């Protein structure tokens, strides 16, 4: 899976919002995050014998800590808590590595809907709503449009795998 088409969509998004001055810096981070996240995701996909359940997620915040559901070296995220899986499986789970293992064993695959690991630290735009305190947040409409534009170049490619 290549970043280039997604990067072009993002370049156009930044241009529409008069943020071209910030694009190169943000894009360098986003492309690097994209590559690492997808490497981890594909490595994990190979550990699932058969996909029985599909969970669609927004996108990881990633950042310096490399926070991601499939990264065993990072803490659990708000997105999917260990206690949720423990409840469903009626069992105790020791740590994140075991959590990922259990997801793989039951055939649970998590797919991000967006290729962009936007956050308030590494990118000028972010997934938080636009407000006076957060002028570079994107509105729900802008978010939907960005997702819609990247569906064929990102999400659909993962579904086909």
Language model features by range: what are they?
Residues 2-161:
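A polyanion-binding, active-site-adjacent surface
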């Amino acid at each position: 899976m290549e970043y280039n088409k997604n990067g072009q969509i993002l370049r156009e998004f930044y241009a529409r919002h008069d943020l071209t001055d910030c694009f190169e810096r943000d894009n360098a981070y986003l492309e690097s995050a994209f590559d690492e996240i997808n490497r981890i995701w594909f490595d994990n996909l190979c550990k699932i014998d058969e996909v029985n359940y599909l969970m669609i997620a927004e996108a990881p915040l990633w950042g310096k800590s490399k926070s991601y559901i499939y990264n065993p070296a990072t803490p659990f995220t708000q997105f999917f808590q260990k206690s949720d899986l423990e409840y469903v499986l009626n069992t105790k789970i020791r740590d994140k590595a075991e959590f990922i293992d259990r997801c793989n064993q039951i055939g649970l695959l998590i797919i991000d809907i967006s290729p962009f690991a936007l956050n308030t630290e590494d990118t000028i735009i972010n997934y938080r709503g636009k407000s006076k305190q957060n002028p570079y947040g994107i509105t729900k409409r802008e978010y939907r449009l960005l997702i819609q534009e990247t569906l064929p170049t990102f999400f659909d490619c993962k579904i086909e795998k």
